A protein has these predicted regions:
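Residues that form or flank phosphate/diphosphate-binding pockets in enzymes
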Residues: 59, 208, 238
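Aromatic-rich peripheral "rim/lid" segments of glycoside hydrolase catalytic domains that contact
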Residues: 23, 120-126, 137-139, 143-216, ...
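Hydrophobic faces of well-ordered beta-strands that scaffold small-molecule active sites
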Residues: 3-7, 48-51, 74-78, 108-111, ...
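Substrate-binding cleft and catalytic face of glycoside hydrolase catalytic domains
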Residues: 1-56, 214-295
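Noncatalytic carbohydrate-binding groove/subsite architecture in carbohydrate-active enzymes
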Residues: 2-3, 22-132, 137-138, 155, ...
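A generic structural signal for ordered secondary structure
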Residues: 110, 131, 141, 218, ...
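Cell-envelope and extracellular/periplasmic
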Residues: 10, 20, 80-81, 113-114, ...
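Residue-level marker for beta-strand->alpha-helix junctions and adjacent short loops that shape enzyme
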Residues: 12, 55, 83, 115-116, ...
Length: 295
């Protein structure tokens, strides 16, 4: 069951939205408002959430409020990875939530929180437990990022290698399961907090790991799952067949479905982070996906 629609992913991060083109996020704001209206036209009861921000910046939320975006939404979301990428300590999580609560009355979801096992699995094990202690009861949705390590043969793209929130080598070690599917120490730690903690797991186009992921999600008792449908993937041959397969596999979970990423051919710049040439096309994608999977 789709329980919420999320509009974009990390819109204040250059790895996901090219704000060198859209310097004040005016294009993004107009696109997000159109997307929210399109989703509501297909399912007026479906909550709409602003894509999780990284870094956690109250100024960005205020910008979205001033541009009328938040008036169209039911929640905002944040992402935090303080043991890997952020410029603050893990113990500052409550302060970071308070910073956002100071500029909006909307509920604040934590749509990605994670710790890598790059340095040591014990660090990730600690990170799961400490994150749960700090966050449970402070947010209506908490999605741990992620279940699966990224295969090292896949790219983890970044626009600024050392910038806060960027994806670099640690990104390959964020899972509770290793690339070969074997569990890490943190898996047992996570199981103590499921189903209060959900999972964020992205699936690549025709991802061979889908069935393995569903098996482990069920074994862990996960109820709340965040994933995405990429507008860029939607332009591929057989896209709907893949989307249908993915969504059928996830029917047993309460899914927050993220709509994001521009087909390179439809961007101002030929890249999935680019603002679209025609923002209405993204809204149309959101409407089609809502109609197909969440109406």
């Amino acid at each position: 069951m789709v329980e919420a629609a999320m509009i974009w992913n990390e819109p204040n991060n250059l790895s996901h939205w090219d704000f060198e083109i859209d310097e004040d996020w005016s294009i993004f704001a107009e696109m997000a408002k159109l997307a929210a209206a399109a989703i509501a036209s297909e399912n007026p009861k479906l909550p709409k959430v602003l894509g999780g921000i990284s870094p956690i910046d109250p100024g960005f939320i205020s910008n979205m409020a001033s541009k009328g975006v938040l008036a169209r939404l039911e929640a905002v979301a944040v992402h935090g990875f303080p043991l890997d990428w952020n410029h603050w300590q893990i113990h500052a999580w409550p302060d970071k939530i308070r910073e956002i609560a100071a500029v909006t009355t909307l509920p604040i979801w934590i749509s990605e929180v994670g710790v890598s096992s790059f340095g040591a699995e014990e660090v990730q094990e600690f990170g799961v437990a400490r994150s749960a202690e700090l966050l449970l009861g402070r947010s209506p949705r908490i999605h741990w990022y992620s279940l699966l390590d990224l295969p090292r043969a896949w790219p983890a793209t970044t626009r600024h290698r050392e910038a806060e929130g960027s994806a670099y080598y640690r990104h390959f070690y964020m899972g509770l399961l290793r690339e070969d599917g074997s569990p890490k120490r943190a898996l047992k730690a996570f199981s103590r907090y499921s189903p209060q903690l959900g999972i964020c797991q992205w699936f690549h186009f025709e991802d061979p790991r889908l069935d393995l992921a569903v098996k482990w999600l069920k074994e862990l008792g996960v109820k709340k799952l965040r994933t995405g449908l990429s507008w860029a993937d939607g332009e591929r041959p057989n896209a709907l067949e893949w989307f249908d397969r993915q969504m059928r596999a996830l029917e047993g979970f309460d899914v927050t479905l993220t709509f994001c990423f521009t087909p390179p051919s439809r961007g101002v710049r030929e890249h999935h982070t680019s603002p679209p040439l025609v923002i209405e096309e993204f809204a149309e994608f959101c409407a089609r996906m809502t109609r197909r999977y969440a109406s």
